[in-house]
């Protein structure tokens, strides 16, 4: 019978041999320009493949009570502007849903929407935006409004040109889509969301995927460990999309609508930038929507736990990846507006290629 020490030594030798063999094979694949990350990722996913549960709402364990502290921690993850926010509103006649910045003078005689003279909120001299409060966030999370008019949206681009998170939006924002809560018309969008999730994983990013309130769209959230210049964050986002176009074989990426923040900076003091509706909307969550989902499209049972487990990216990580992924067209497109910038899957047809910093005050 072998000595235990001898057994351990033999096992260690076998492990070393396997690691060496593994590295040699990886080098051969790298030299041949063959990627093994996609196959490895798919294998790992298949290992944990779980059937889709049709009862998505029942999977979720809802807290018996949502406290002000929970609301504060929630906003700490989705930290947008605090001096202005938006709420969902449904037109009683048309049934269309839209999000409006909240104003102290809304629908008073000083409100141009009531007067209907065509003046936008940002050009209104009487605008007096409301600041977001813990009560607003609690109402959003509790979801007691029958028509979801308690759902809030935030503006990710802060007034100083920084942001604390980024989002890839796979909702339908075509004209008329507001009638169905911005739902996509078919299920092909799911393939693109999975591709974007895989792109993140392949490049060392652990994203949080949310199924939208319609159940027919998604948001992919990436959190940052401190306020970072939106211009840098957007350069990182564009570089990630370009890198993904090299790694993932997709015929198109037509359901990807936009990346937020959608601007590098605000054009003036009256500008707000694009808004994004926050997840964990109490009413939609009952049906398993506005919920965080795994790679099998099943809602996580403990939504709060998965949210707070997600890592935050540092500025150093973003800068390193931008440098690593840089290519000749970066200088051309770095400052492009989202609507003007050609999507990478289209462009590929033409080219070869710890702790949060800051103080949060919500009253």
Briefly describe each language-model feature range.
Residues 151-190, 194, 225-352, 356:
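DNA replication initiation modules
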Residues 2, 57-216, 223-239:
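Signature for HUH/AEP ssDNA processing cores
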Residues 38, 42-65, 330-362:
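Acidic, low-complexity intrinsically disordered tails
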